[in-house]
Amino acid sequence: MEELEMKVFEAFAKDWALVTAGSMDRFNTMTIGWGAMGTLWGKSAVTVYVKPVRYTHEYLDANEYFTVCFFPKDYKKDLSLLGSRSGRDGDKVAETALTPVAVEGSVGFAQASLTLLCKKIYRQDMDTAAMPEDVVKRNYEVEAPHTMYIGEVVKVL
């Protein structure tokens, strides 16, 4: 596995990323601001969090692979759009300057400065009973909690 040099605490929260699952003929992507990178079971891993109401959730559940793509700051407007519209309502990617590309069993984007191809190795719905009360009030009083997806990083592009 290649070494990555990045500010991991800013990569998700400040710079954002796209998580994408599916194939070139049928995929969905969404902007994520929560995530983690590290190791699990001796493997390089990425964790992403997606609410069950999001269209991308269906694709993550149905597919073995997903990508996490990071972009130069010039694409922040595109990531904002992809995080505010649903793929259920049409081709939101067509409204951006991003070009989808096939990535060995999933989909990435030509403009990404970093693409992590991940094989899904764990999926778990988060349990509000195990969370601090203030976190539940702030994030989960209206909608169900996120699903956590952990992917083994099988390729860095």
Predicted ranges, named:
Residues 1-157:
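Basic, polyanion-binding surface patches
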